[in-house]
């Protein structure tokens, strides 16, 4: 099998996975040259985390950084007089689905020997990257709006991350993080292509939970859309 690489789908520019980067030279998002799928026989059923689907990741990561993310309950319930199945992602280690993306992204950054990262987040993304950064031995800076939830800021700090409060809008927070990213690697859950490799495992889990059949429909609450993009 050919080695995967990163590609800017706007320009066609290609980048090796050996080069730490989160965007193209023209600041466009990056995707993988090949998006691998998986068959039931490739699932590592003894692994009780998203790493049971590691055969679907674009490259080998021999030493994953895992806190037991994934394998969350799928619970039947009545919703507007219809039968629905609820995926309880709040059972994740830090309380959200973003642990899936953080696990794969931080595992890959550790493999690339990244020592310090910065991320802009108003809550769950920052908590996930702070936790998995601590598990990976990577120093984490979280840039967050000054009006962010106090309990969420406390959670981020509890994992040992440095919190940088920015007055103003969410966009101003992102700009502050990008300024810091001139000297520290930008581990953005909205930009780094390996983050979606983690969130896509939600789709594999639903498929496996339903005896390897896709659900009729998936309803996903969304902000930036990483859960939707992962399942897609």
PLM features: residue spans?
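PLP-dependent amino-acid enzyme catalytic core
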Residues: 1-232
């Amino acid at each position: 099998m050919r080695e995967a690489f990163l590609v800017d789908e706007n320009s066609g520019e290609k980048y090796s996975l050996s080069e730490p980067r989160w965007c193209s030279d023209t600041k466009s998002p990056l995707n993988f040259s090949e998006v691998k799928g998986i068959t039931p026989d490739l699932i590592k059923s003894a692994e009780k985390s998203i790493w049971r689907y590691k055969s679907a990741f674009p490259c080998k990561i021999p030493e994953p950084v895992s806190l037991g993310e994934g394998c969350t309950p799928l619970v039947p319930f009545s919703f507007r007089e219809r039968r629905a199945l609820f995926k309880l992602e709040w059972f994740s280690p830090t309380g959200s689905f973003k642990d899936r993306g953080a696990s794969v992204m931080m595992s890959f950054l550790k493999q690339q020997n990244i020592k310090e990262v910065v991320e802009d987040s108003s809550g769950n993304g920052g908590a996930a990257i702070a936790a998995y950064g601590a598990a990976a031995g990577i120093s984490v800076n979280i840039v967050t709006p000054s009006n962010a939830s106090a309990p969420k800021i406390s959670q981020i700090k509890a994992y040992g991350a440095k919190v940088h409060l920015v007055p103003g809008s969410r966009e101003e927070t992102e700009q502050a993080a990008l300024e810091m990213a001139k000297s520290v690697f930008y581990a953005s859950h909205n930009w780094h292509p390996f983050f979606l490799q983690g969130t896509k495992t939600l789709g594999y889990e639903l498929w496996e939970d339903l005896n390897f059949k896709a659900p009729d429909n998936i309803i996903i609450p969304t902000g930036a859309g990483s859960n939707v993009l992962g399942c897609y």
